UniProtKB/Swiss-Prot annotation:
CDD domains hit by this protein: Kunitz_ixolaris_1, Kunitz_ixolaris_2
One of the record's GO molecular function terms: serine-type endopeptidase inhibitor activity
GO cellular component: extracellular region
Highest taxon of the lineage: Eukaryota
Summary of the tissues where the protein is detected: Saliva (at protein level). Salivary gland.
Protein name in UniProt: Ixolaris
Transmembrane segments: none
UniProt cross-references to SUPFAM superfamilies, sorted A to Z: BPTI-like (SSF57362)
Chief location bin: secreted
PROSITE patterns documented for this protein: BPTI_KUNITZ_2
Other observations noted: In mouse model of melanoma, ixolaris labeled with iodine-131 is able to recognize tissue factor (F3)-expressing tumors and demonstrates anti-metastatic effect.
Oligomeric and partner information: Monomer. Interacts with host coagulation factor X/F10 (inactive and activated).
Amino acid sequence: MRAVSCFLYYGVAWIALGSWGASSSAERVSEMDIYEFESWVSCLDPEQVTCESQEGTHASYNRKTGQCEEQKGTECGGGENHFETLLKCNESCNDAPKPPCSLEVDYGVGRANIPRWYYDTNNATCEMFTYGGITGNKNNFESEEECKETCKGFSLLKKVNVTIN
């Protein structure tokens, strides 16, 4: 019988496949796939960042403007979208690819009320929304089929090659 164990530790997902009743730990975990979040994922984290100290500054990526911006506060937590300096934020976020399927839904502006589809990374499904007709982002598909085809197999994780002795 095979068992699957999953662990998430500091943005790295460990998935171990093993056998029940094996005599040694080496036999119990015969295969291990390790995944880590793509480097740009922290830039898109929507969770609210809170800072313990209001002294000094930190930087975070503004998904609406597409730029890193300085914010008040240090010793921040709560979300992954915070960096010690503007330089570190720029290095991580400004040139990072942002696949359409990774973007949050953007309803746009206007009164067109166009039915469209977007990929919801939380549920890994294509969902319908009403598009205003102006601006928005590339996570905006004309049909559910186009959304599913574009985002098929999309993941915020990448496989890391590891050799286990």
